[in-house]
Amino acid sequence: MDFLTSLVNSMPGAVAQGLIWGIMAIGVYITYRILDVADLTVDGSLGTGGAVCVVLVLNGVPVGVALVAATLAGMLAGLVTGLFHTACGIPAILAGILTQLALYSVNLRIMGTGTGGGKANLPISVDKYSLLVSARYVRALALNNPIFVLLIFCAILIGVLYWFFGTELGCSLRATGANQHMARAQGINTNVTIVLGLMVSNGLVALAGGLLSQYQGFSDINMGRGAIVIGLAAVIIGEVIFGKIFRNFALKLTAAVIGAIIYYIVMNFVLRMGLSTDDLKLLTALVVAVFLTIPYWKGKYFTKGPVKKGGKDNA
């Protein structure tokens, strides 16, 4: 009974975290599924968003403005990765690693603003600052409950992205990911669309970082470590469970958010079962591996191919 009570009490927190990471998962979806680019910048840009947001709020900047600044900082990180890849000819995965590596020092510099040196952790209290979301109110039946706020946030975000990817520019971005050679033949500057896609993706990741730092009450230099794996887990879980049902683009983005919620509910359940937090990364890797393997096995072992008819007429 104590286990069930503890599990139920922890569910609101898991859902709230899932919604925040769902925004990050949408960013991963844009590069992984739409652009078909393996971008590892997100491990750094998530921390950049958190660092920028917390530093600005601590210096008296309104939360809304701080979140916009965090998003722009993430877009700048995506721009750097995009230029590494398109202008310098560096492979996308290596370009992301280089930017991620550089962002570690950049984030330390940002978090040390006004303190005379780099800081690995910056706390921020909802008692002193008007934050948009906070874990303190996750069980409150009020409008400041982070679940309610984040649901509205995700709905608006998905609506805006659905509109954007329906525009000519958005369709060009999707065409680039589908077939770069054909996109070029249609007069699309694929270098521009790749850079734009990376900017949008990392902007969303940094936005999630800003929200996460508010929710947990601090920004940490290592908060983005392993973010790409969590994002991939959310995207893949959503696709495996809802891939046959959700055909609309907006619903596919929704599936990524739901995948993140499911991921955190599962992680929460496993932790309540007694698993050490030291093993979370191992469990995450196993979850991603399993959900990546399922579609392959389904296609290989459970999909019947066309039956070939033999006989004299076909000899």
Q: What is each stretch, according to the model?
A:
Residues 205-282:
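Transmembrane alpha-helical segments in multi-pass inner-membrane proteins
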Residues 6, 178-185, 189-192, 251-254, ...:
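Cytosolic-side transmembrane-helix boundaries in multi-pass membrane proteins
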Residues 92, 96-166, 196, 220-221, ...:
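Transmembrane helix-bundle core of multi-pass membrane transporters
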Residues 17, 93-94, 123-127, 146-151, ...:
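Loop-to-transmembrane alpha-helix initiation sites
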Residues 61-101, 106, 155, 258-259, ...:
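Alpha-helical transmembrane segments within multi-pass membrane transporters and channels
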Residues 32-87, 140, 245, 272:
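Membrane-embedded helix boundary and interhelical linker motif in transport proteins
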Residues 77, 143-224, 228:
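Helix-loop-helix "hairpin" substructures at the membrane interface of multi-pass membrane proteins
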Residues 1-24, 52, 59-65, 133, ...:
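Membrane-interfacial amphipathic/re-entrant helices at transmembrane-helix boundaries
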